[in-house]
A protein has these predicted regions:
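Terminal targeting signals and extreme-terminal segments of soluble enzymes
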Residues: 1-126
Length: 126
């Protein structure tokens, strides 16, 4: 039997609830731009999938995430949930850029058709 090497990953985040109150007084675009500028911490999910908001304009959001081995499924490729989470995040934030202060949103449905698998060798996904 092959000896397995234990890997570890530390995930750190800031509780998003106190900052979420700011969303009540800022437009969605202002809120996300403040996140990019480091004035508001990224949501905890960003730590899990190495997610970064690259840029936002009205009706558009650009994000990047970098898969690593901690995102693998049992067959040795990145779990589809990683891709679905990235897609859900970027689509939701694109909607958020159009919303006035105090307006919330949520995803009602998400469908993903996969064309090929990802691995940690894929690198940054935008």
């Amino acid at each position: 039997m092959t000896e397995l090497t234990q890997q570890t990953k530390t995930i750190a985040w800031v509780d998003p609830r106190p900052q979420a109150v700011q969303a009540l007084t800022m437009t969605g675009l202002e809120y996300l731009q403040a996140m990019i500028d480091g004035e508001i911490p990224a949501p905890p999910i960003a730590s899990h999938i190495n997610l970064e908001i690259v840029g936002v304009t009205t009706g558009e959001a650009v994000m990047a995430a970098t898969p690593d081995e901690s995102h693998y499924n049992p067959i040795g490729s990145v779990h589809g949930g990683f891709v679905a989470t990235l897609l859900d995040s970027v689509c939701g934030c694109a909607v958020q850029t159009t919303l006035p202060a105090g307006t919330a949103y949520t995803s009602l449905d998400l469908s993903v058709n996969f064309l090929r698998g990802l691995t940690s060798d894929t690198g940054r996904v935008i």
